[in-house]
C-alpha cells in the first residue's frame, strides 16, 4: 500500500531537560553522507543544542539535504536544530525499517526538491512528511528489515576489509621504498641493502 511518511512516522520535538554532563551531542558534522551508522559525536556539556533524541531515532540532516546525511542513533542524546529527529509509529511502521526509508535516493531527492533557502537550504518536516512510498504489511516489513540490515552488515564488513587491504598494500609498498632508499649498487656486488 502507498503511504505518506507522516502517516507512519513522526518528528520528535522533545528537548533535553536534565543534566548535560557526559550526554552525547550530535551535530551535522557527525552525520556521514550515505551512512546509516552514527560513528562520531561530542561529549560536551557546554552545548547550546537542546533537541533530544532516543536510541533508535533516525537523525536526518535537514540542512543541505543533497549531502544525504541521516543515521540511526545508537544511544540517547542531544542534537543540533538542523537535525530532524524522526521516529516510527510502531503500529504502522517497523522502527528497524525506517532508516532505509530515510537513507535512500528517492527520499533525499524529495527533500532537496522541498528545501527552502539559497545559501543553506533546509527541509521542513511539514514537507518531508508528504513523501510517498510503497509500504508492505508489518509481517513483511520484518523480513524486509532483516534482509536490509544483513545487506548493510555485509557492506560494512566489505568496507572494513577494503580499508585493511589498502593499509596492508600501502605498508608493503612503503616498506619496499624504505629498503630501496637504503640500498646501494656496485658493479661487482650488484644491489645491496644497508643493514
Predicted regions and their residues:
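Non-catalytic DNA-recognition/assembly elements of restriction-modification systems
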Residues: 1-18, 130-146, 153-195
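A structure-centric signal for secondary-structure junctions around beta-strands
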Residues: 20-22, 80, 95, 128
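A short beta-sheet element
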Residues: 50-51, 58-103
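A short glycine-rich beta-alpha junction/loop motif
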Residues: 63, 77-84, 117-139
